[in-house]
């Protein structure tokens, strides 16, 4: 896993966190 893959995973985690934050309110 390269660094690029880790960066993509990190961005995906941020996106999921933002979606969850909006749902929770």
From Swiss-Prot:
Named cofactor requirement(s): pyridoxal 5'-phosphate
Involved pathway(s): Amino-acid biosynthesis; D-alanine biosynthesis; D-alanine from L-alanine: step 1/1
Single annotated GO MF: alanine racemase activity
EC number of the protein: 5.1.1.1
pH profile of the protein: Optimum pH is 8.3.
Temperature and thermostability: Optimum temperature is 30 degrees Celsius. Thermolabile and psychrotrophic. Shows catalytic activity even at 0 degree Celsius.
Biological process according to GO: D-alanine biosynthetic process
Family: Belongs to the alanine racemase family.
Subunit structure: Homodimer.
Record-given protein name: Alanine racemase
């Amino acid at each position: 896993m390269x660094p690029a893959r880790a960066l993509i995973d990190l961005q995906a985690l941020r996106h999921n966190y933002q979606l969850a934050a909006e749902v929770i309110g």
